Regions:
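Terminal targeting signals and extreme-terminal segments of soluble enzymes
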Residues: 1-175
Length: 175
């Protein structure tokens, strides 16, 4: 961009269909409010929608316990949970899982630190092809230090399978 390298990428691809189908995990889907109790991102205040235009590509329904920040009352817990599907009605696929891994506002919003949080490093894993239907996505941070925070993400499909994971290191938003 303007003659300056802004991003580098290292990617590894595999055939998900060639992987064994056995699953042994202690991971469990997040505790999220039922879909009909969640709040559509489309009802977000205009300033929030302007900050995150990517959200318009999804039908996002936020767990009401996670969105106090949108109304000036962050809950102080570094976690966001939402139901997600593509806005155009397509069923989820591997590419939409990748997009979902970085689709929610930074968890720093819930900590009372809204704003752009530049990514330093992002690692993503697509674990399986998703089943049709809504995806559940959860972002969490456990450590804010040195002007940075880590954010872990999990994406679960409608069959209750963990289909995507990510870890991101980002800079704190500037106030």
């Amino acid at each position: 961009q303007d003659g300056v390298e802004r991003i580098t990428s290292l990617t590894t691809f595999a055939d998900l269909g060639a992987l064994p189908h056995d699953v042994s995990t202690t991971a469990t889907p997040p505790d999220i409010a039922p879909l009909d109790r969640c709040v559509s991102a489309a009802s977000s205040p205009e300033h929030v929608r302007r900050m995150a235009p990517l959200m318009q590509r999804f039908d996002l329904r936020f767990d009401p316990d996670c969105i106090g920040w949108a109304h000036g009352a962050p809950n102080g817990v570094g976690s966001m949970r939402a139901w997600m599907r593509l806005a155009d009605g397509r069923e989820p696929d591997v590419m939409s899982v990748l997009m979902t891994l970085d689709s929610l506002p930074p968890t720093t919003f819930a900590l009372g630190m809204p704003g752009w949080a530049p990514t330093i490093e992002l690692t993503t894993h697509v674990r399986a092809r998703p089943a049709p239907g809504w995806l559940v996505v959860q972002h969490r941070t456990r450590n804010v230090a040195g002007g940075m925070f880590e954010e872990d993400c999990e994406v679960w499909d409608s069959a209750g399978r963990l289909v995507g994971q990510a870890r991101q290191l980002a800079m704190l938003p500037r106030h």
